[in-house]
Curated annotation (Swiss-Prot):
It catalyses: D-glucose + NAD(+) = D-glucono-1,5-lactone + NADH + H(+); D-glucose + NADP(+) = D-glucono-1,5-lactone + NADPH + H(+). It comes from Priestia megaterium. Homotetramer. The gene is gdhA. This is Glucose 1-dehydrogenase A. Pfam families: adh_short_C2.
Amino acid sequence: MYTDLKDKVVVITGGSTGLGRAMAVRFGQEEAKVVINYYNNEEEALDAKKEVEEAGGQAIIVQGDVTKEEDVVNLVQTAIKEFGTLDVMINNAGVENPVPSHELSLDNWNKVIDTNLTGAFLGSREAIKYFVENDIKGNVINMSSVHEMIPWPLFVHYAASKGGMKLMTETLALEYAPKGIRVNNIGPGAMNTPINAEKFADPEQRADVESMIPMGYIGKPEEVAAVAAFLASSQASYVTGITLFADGGMTKYPSFQAGRG
């Protein structure tokens, strides 16, 4: 536990499910004030809010589409209005879907890029704007992926969004380091989340993925949440501009680096 996270205001996009929800609960355990952004499932968001509160934190939910500039502006401003400030912005919302690249429509490409990359930029921009204007040494955490460095056949749009996120994060970190604002990525590997539930329910597919992970198992959302808590804490005060991979060593596995998966 990180005592300095108590009462910190943390915004999490896509915070009602999967990795986002696990992070929300972890910050609840840290007694933080959590702003849970969700896209369209209010019931799921309310469940996440309850879980955060039961863990020891405070929480509100805010509906919004991260591809819409006005929604992201509203999200950040709502956090500030409700809790008085902003300390940590976690850009977690993301989508993926497999399509052969020669069949990928522009609409599909744009949906993934707009959600994963543009949405993260908008969240970063609005948070940093507030930090700069109020002389706050704030923290931005972007949810990247092992695929910011590993090519992924059938997911060219997703890989492009995460590759772009890598350099976006590094650039923002360099630009705002003199102001004490830290910007980092988390790069999860294979995770037991709802987006992967169908795939990992198939024993053969699950075993195939596990065979590419040196640690031998698919990660738990709580393991990514622990990384987020560390990066948000003062224990990481000298850490900026990096991607911290939580992947069980997947990025070091030769056959996966060759494009398998």
